[in-house]
Regions:
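Extracellular adhesion/carbohydrate-binding repeat motifs centered on closely spaced tryptophans
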Residues: 1-156
């Protein structure tokens, strides 16, 4: 059975099958894994309901890559195309992805207590058992290099 892609006046893409019906859900067309919403619109440049990210141009499922959603939200998808969560090592860099949403932590402390660079997202080594200044705020890092919170006795 053959079909064809077509677009609407808003630049959205669809695929009609041999019966003239719009495809829906996960599909493989010409060897490419693509996804169509319930209204038939192809998902491009975003995560679909199946949890995978689809390329903004080709619409093909993305694997083993950083992907961006909107202006500044970064994610990483694995060999299957699924979001990563928590502490990860990618390209020899220790990075962190939010446990709930999978967004990369940049320019902030993650829930694991480490700080991640605002540009690269790589974990910053502040040393151990010392005060550090980040964005005009002072923090204390413990013997593991993690930020401490709450009341603390330092050198006491």
């Amino acid at each position: 059975s053959t079909g064809h892609y077509y677009s609407d006046d808003k630049g959205n893409w669809y695929y009609k099958d041999a019966n003239g019906e719009n495809l829906k859900g996960a599909q493989t067309i010409d060897g490419q894994n693509v996804y169509f919403e319930n209204n038939g619109r192809q998902v491009k440049g975003d995560f679909a309901e199946d949890g995978y990210y689809y390329d903004g141009n080709s619409g093909q499922r993305v694997t083993n890559s950083y992907v961006r959603r909107g202006a500044s939200l970064w994610f990483y998808v694995d060999a299957e195309g699924r979001k990563l969560f928590g502490e990860q090592t990618i390209n020899n860099q220790d990075v962190y992805f939010d446990q709930n949403y999978g967004t990369q932590v940049k320019g902030n402390f993650a829930s694991n207590g480490y700080y991640y660079d605002e540009d690269s997202g790589a974990r910053v080594d502040f040393g151990k058992n010392q005060f550090v200044k980040v964005d005009n705020n002072w923090y204390y890092v413990d013997n593991q290099g993690k930020i401490v919170k709450g009341a603390q006795t330092i050198d006491g």
